[in-house]
Each structure stands twice: as C-alpha cells, then as structure tokens.
Regions:
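A mature extracytoplasmic/lumenal domain signature
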Residues: 84, 88, 96, 121, ...
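Exported/periplasmic cell-wall-interacting domains
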Residues: 78, 99-112, 146-152, 156-229
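Short, surface-exposed charged micro-motifs
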Residues: 59, 114-116, 174
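A structural motif detector for short, solvent-exposed N-terminal "entry" segments of globular domains
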Residues: 102-145
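Extracytoplasmic/secreted envelope proteins and their assembly/folding machinery
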Residues: 45, 49, 65-68, 89, ...
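N-terminal low-complexity, Pro/Thr-rich disordered segments
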Residues: 1-46, 53, 104-105
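Short acidic, glycine/serine/threonine-rich helix-capping segments at coil-helix boundaries
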Residues: 31-94
Length: 229
C-alpha cells in the first residue's frame, strides 16, 4: 500500500541538503573514540580485512590498524584511526565494485534498463544490456523487521518532492517500485549501523542523478541480504 503524500507535487519543495552532508564520518564505539590507532576490532573487521587484502581473522592487529588508517586517510574518512566501521566498509566495497562490478553475475543482463540492487554489498547501479547507464553507488536498505523486498519489481510511481505520510519526513526524488518501498534521497550518512524502513536510500546527489536515469515502468532487480539484518 502506498499512502498519498502529505504535500502535493511542488506544493512545498523538499529542503536542499546542508553543506558538508556528504562528508565521510565513521561511527565509533566509545572504546575507539580519541584513539590515534584503535586496538578495537570494528563491526566490519572481517569485511574490511578482505577488501584491503589483509589477513582475515576478525581481530585488530597493529598492522591492520595502520593499513585501515592509511585507507581512511586516503579516502578522507574521519576520524582516521583504523576502526573498521560501516563507513569504511561501504567505501571499500564501492571502490572494489568500480573494478569488478558484479563478480557473482547476480544481476540479469537484459535489453531493457534494469536497476540492480545488491543488498549483500549495499550497492546499486543501472544497466541496459552491457552498458552501465548509472554507475555503482552506495545504498542503505531495510533494517531488521523492515526488509527490502527482493526479486523483480517495476518503477510504478515517481514523485520528486515526496513527503512521507507515515513518518512525516521528506523523501526527495522518490521512485516507488514495491508498495511503499522506493529509491529516494536522504540527508546525511548512507552507511549507518542500522538500515532504512524498507526503502533503498541514496545520498542526495546520487538520488538526483538516478531520477534522470530511471523512468516509470523500468525494471528493478534486488537480491541478497543487508549485513546484520
């Protein structure tokens, strides 16, 4: 079920994001706050170790911390203290996907446009045949109890200045594909410890670009499961 928006299209434009909203700021537990190079293993330790070519043991070593800290410094993730949190993992997954977009060949290649959503890696892209028409970006999908529905869907309603009737919050560049689940922009960090309430969240700039790529009737294919959900 999709409830009508609180505001009509164009009646009240959704707010623009604040400056600096796309900065990469890592989520830290108290034990890692203030450390120059943390000894605490991060929630995404194994994933980050694998992506950075480190020994995958889920334990934080001095070498691990130095390597993760160097990666964070290079990618302008703050604070750069070696903690393997959701922001560091998301950035590492994105860079890996730019080199090898779909290693498992999970997204079907069709003659028509398909929005590919990989819940395992929290990534999405759009392709038409062999051509990628919207490059891979980080996303945030549904949390526990609000799983983003997998399988085939179609974009059936697009509403640029959407306000949620359920949560009374702006959902810029909404493109609905399954009931109340939609691609839409959020204000702030995409890579967070908890997920969305079912929608596929994108950074504001990426959602705006996706708006110009997808059309009503375009297909959406979703697979996998959000880590921790």
């Amino acid at each position: 079920q999709v409830l009508p928006p609180l505001q009509g299209e164009g009646d009240v434009p959704v707010p623009e994001p604040e400056e600096g909203v796309d900065e990469l700021v890592e989520y830290l537990p108290r034990s890692a706050v203030g450390a120059a190079c943390t000894a605490t293993a991060g929630a995404y330790q194994r994933k980050v170790e694998r992506l950075l070519g480190l020994v995958v043991d889920g334990k934080q070593s001095v070498a691990d911390c130095k390597a993760i800290k160097a990666f964070q410094t290079r990618e302008k993730i703050k604070p750069a203290n070696g903690y393997a949190g959701p922001v560091t993992w998301a950035r590492a997954e994105l860079l890996a996907a730019r080199k090898d977009l779909d290693p498992g060949r999970r997204c079907p290649v069709k003659k028509y446009a398909v929005a590919c959503v990989d819940l395992d890696r929290q990534l999405m892209w759009v392709r038409k045949g062999k051509k990628v028409t919207f490059g891979v970006v980080n996303i945030r999908s549904g949390r526990v109890g609000y799983a983003t529905r997998t399988g085939w869907h179609s974009v059936y309603w697009r509403h640029k200045d959407h306000w949620s009737s359920i949560y009374n919050t702006p959902m810029p560049y909404s493109q609905f594909f399954s009931g109340g689940q939609a691609f839409h922009a959020v204000y702030g960090q995409i890579a967070t410890p908890t997920g969305s309430r079912g929608c596929v969240n994108l950074g504001y700039g990426n959602a705006r670009k996706l708006w110009d790529v997808l059309r009503k009737g375009d297909r959406v294919y979703i697979w996998g499961k959000r880590p921790g959900s």
